[in-house]
């Protein structure tokens, strides 16, 4: 399988219902929080793919080859706090290089800010690892999903203070880890 075929395989494995247990380390305030999340992933229709492109003012190149998904999740923290969200996302491969497949990751709603957003992704076909990097107004989120097998994923979330333009990511605010198990 080439990189694009492995990318499709990765997401075919991700479609369905999942349960995750996560631990978040808030380094800026010295707190640790545990939570559990149930989420579902399903494919997007061509019409919804086009809407995600339009919401982000992204050039429409035809959506047939783009992988698009609807994500819905409900999270409960160990303190009993509940949060949920639904969003549509689209992955637009731009190039294949020595580090794998790279491209744009579009959402109709961002996690940190309630607006459409274009981020970047990199997919390593050897390790079946997807890294998504989103630059928000105040922070930069680096979210990594590693598919260990079709029913088990590892998740890592790193959130940095957004540095001045052109400067490296240095000030880490949050580190999160999760084990995600497929239910259906």
From Swiss-Prot:
GO molecular function ontology, one term from the record: lyase activity
Family statement drawn from the similarity comment of this UniProt entry: Belongs to the CpcS/CpeS biliprotein lyase family.
Listed Gene3D superfamilies: 2.40.128.20
Enzyme Commission number: 4.-.-.-
Keyword Lyase: yes
UniProt protein name: Chromophore lyase CpcS/CpeS 1
Signal sequence residues: none
Function: Covalently attaches a chromophore to Cys residue(s) of phycobiliproteins.
Domain of life: Bacteria
Record keywords: Lyase
A Pfam family the protein falls into: CpeS
Organism: Synechococcus sp. (strain JA-3-3Ab) (Cyanobacteria bacterium Yellowstone A-Prime)
Keyword Transmembrane: no
First-level EC class: lyase
